[in-house]
UniProtKB/Swiss-Prot annotation:
Belongs to the class-II pyridoxal-phosphate-dependent aminotransferase family. It is found in: Endoplasmic reticulum membrane. The lineage of its organism: Eukaryota, Viridiplantae, Streptophyta, Embryophyta, Tracheophyta. The fbr11-1 mutant is incapable of initiating programmed cell death (PCD) after induction by fumonisin B1 (FB1), a specific inhibitor of ceramide synthase. It comes from Arabidopsis thaliana. This is Long chain base biosynthesis protein 1. It is an enzyme of class 2 (transferase). The chain crosses the membrane at residues 32-52. Keywords: Acyltransferase, Apoptosis, Endoplasmic reticulum, Lipid metabolism, Membrane, Pyridoxal phosphate, Sphingolipid metabolism, Transferase, Transmembrane, Transmembrane helix. The gene is LCB1.
Amino acid sequence: MASNLVEMFNAALNWVTMILESPSARVVLFGVPIRGHFFVEGLLGVVIIILLTRKSYKPPKRPLTEQEIDELCDEWVPEPLIPPITEDMKHEPPVLESAAGPHTTVNGKDVVNFASANYLGLIGHEKLLESCTSALEKYGVGSCGPRGFYGTIDVHLDCETRISKFLGTPDSILYSYGLSTMFSTIPCFCKKGDVIVADEGVHWGIQNGLQLSRSTIVYFKHNDMESLRITLEKIMTKYKRSKNLRRYIVAEAVYQNSGQIAPLDEIVKLKEKYRFRVILDESNSFGVLGRSGRGLAEHHSVPIEKIDVVTAAMGHALATEGGFCTGNARIIDYQRLSSSGYVFSASLPPYLASAAITAIDVIDQNPDMLVKLKQNVALLWKGLSDIKGMSLTSNRESPIVFLKLEKSSGSAKDDLLLLEKMADRALKEDSLLVVSSKRSFLDKCRLPVGIKLYVSAGHSESDLLKASESLKRLASELLLKS
């Protein structure tokens, strides 16, 4: 049977070959001989055109039966709306029942509060409350729109002017939410193809801004200027031929995750040597560092013009809400058109802008608050200097006092559980509210976890001694026995 098929195929092939090679299959058109294979190719072209112009075949539609619908529904397994709850997520933080001042109320009990960044003790300040009340009576609660439409009110412009005057910069811009300031400002200036060199210890808001920028991100070791220099050197070597490459250094003045203070003078020297721009977040230094609270530039005696972009949240030292960015007029004007947090968000409620103006006035008129804050930081450092099982790793002038475990278990999760147990006992046994440096799974910071204490000018000497004694007792009971 197979041999018969082969013979039939060969016979058909010979017949086609004979037809195509016969003299009758050759045509002369305008002096050009047309052979048989041209005929076949033309025929194929016609077939292709017919196939392309035909309507596609659509199988007849048949609605599913009730039984088929039920079977599909039974087989469907929906994805969970949220990720599964892990053991470390079950820890419930304490809930404040009053304002987050130096003392607050938790579970109906008065506690000493070292968990709020109320550095100057302005939460509940009489002048700020009066300012908020008068602004509410004049403007109402909200601004009812973004700044570029109908959300700009005179108090917003007054606040921007007051910030610029306080810091000695040409212009400023307000944001309605402190955290959004950094993750709107960074993508505003940094785009795909740019290079950003960032400290590995920056907080989550900055990390989010770096991700949204879609730039090439390179991290250097936390607060290590030699690591920064080597990183900048490598980038300049790698992109030597890229003439229009935009390059940025991103850092915090006081690092929220460690309490370290950035050496701005050295950063500026490296910036000028390698021709980078600097974006600096002063959320934890504005109103705190420097002789008059003007931040890291004053602290290191560096002209503020050396910093290209300065941002800060106003929810810390100023005891209000929102954030700002300050710098030269071109930097600020560009954000008014291109920064998503400014363009698309409702503007800062007027009463909060009014409170910020009043807070800056209070700082200007009461330099003794800064002196008191520095004294409190020094007193807490002295009290915790001999704590067993933990070590102080923050800067001595930082308002964030950071206690790190001397002996880690090797697992950040286990270390965190131990620190949370310590914080829970401090609250229950000594009415002391402190926090561990808990981070979400989205946070890329890999610095060691620890206990953070936010020092306030409103803390009394007895508050600081109470914190020192409580933590030393708990450290000896929990850490030395484990």
